[in-house]
Amino acid sequence: MEGSFSDGGALPEGLAEEAEPQGAAWSGDSGTVSQSHSSASGPWEDEGAEDGAPGRDLPLLRRAAAGYAACLLPGAGARPEVEALDASLEDLLTRVDEFVGMLDMLRGDSSHVVSEGVPRIHAKAAEMRRIYSRIDRLEAFVRMVGGRVARMEEQVTKAEAELGTFPRAFKKLLHTMNVPSLFSKSAPSRPQQAGYEAPVLFRTEDYFPCCSERPQL
């Protein structure tokens, strides 16, 4: 009978309308799962299924992955290329550490020179300026002494020219001899000379006082 559910007949209209969307949903889910399964399968399987050789590129991919893993990942037996790279990197790191240490040393020396050396050099420069001033005064003193000595030599030369120079031994010989008075002649009278005026000389004490006092140059 139409509309009876227990006899295995057709469902009522309301139940039939609810059952149709559920069936469509089930069919849609099954289609999605099958489609995802087909998309999850590798491209080599599709091409292999088409060409008749399933998974022909899989060994090649595995070998490539193993080669990259051997190069990049550490293993029990390191390859020569990896060992050479490690050695070069260690050498490079050592040189970088040495360079950084040298830079630190230079930075420390520069700061030491700026903080201690420059003030010391400035103080020495001021002291050298004082020494140069003393040297200038000493040179002026030497020139003054040279001028005084030159004037003294001129006066000595002039006195020798006026008084004459006679050997001392010959003078003694003449004093011991008795010459008759008739042979003696009156010595011509010499003109009276002016008195000797000693030149003005410097005093060393004025320029070089005692050791207890500081020299005044």
Swiss-Prot record:
Residue ranges, annotated region (Disordered): 1-57
Any one cellular-component term (Gene Ontology): cytoplasm
Cell compartment(s), UniProt: Cytoplasm
UniProt family annotation: Belongs to the BLOC1S4 family.
Record text on subunit structure and interactions: Interacts with BLOC1S5 and BLOC1S6. Component of the biogenesis of lysosome-related organelles complex 1 (BLOC-1) composed of BLOC1S1, BLOC1S2, BLOC1S3, BLOC1S4, BLOC1S5, BLOC1S6, DTNBP1/BLOC1S7 and SNAPIN/BLOC1S8. Octamer composed of one copy each BLOC1S1, BLOC1S2, BLOC1S3, BLOC1S4, BLOC1S5, BLOC1S6, DTNBP1/BLOC1S7 and SNAPIN/BLOC1S8. The BLOC-1 complex associates with the AP-3 protein complex and membrane protein cargos.
Role, per record: Component of the BLOC-1 complex, a complex that is required for normal biogenesis of lysosome-related organelles (LRO), such as platelet dense granules and melanosomes. In concert with the AP-3 complex, the BLOC-1 complex is required to target membrane protein cargos into vesicles assembled at cell bodies for delivery into neurites and nerve terminals. The BLOC-1 complex, in association with SNARE proteins, is also proposed to be involved in neurite extension. Plays a role in intracellular vesicle trafficking.
Protein name, as recorded: Biogenesis of lysosome-related organelles complex 1 subunit 4
Naturally occurring in which organism (per UniProt): Homo sapiens
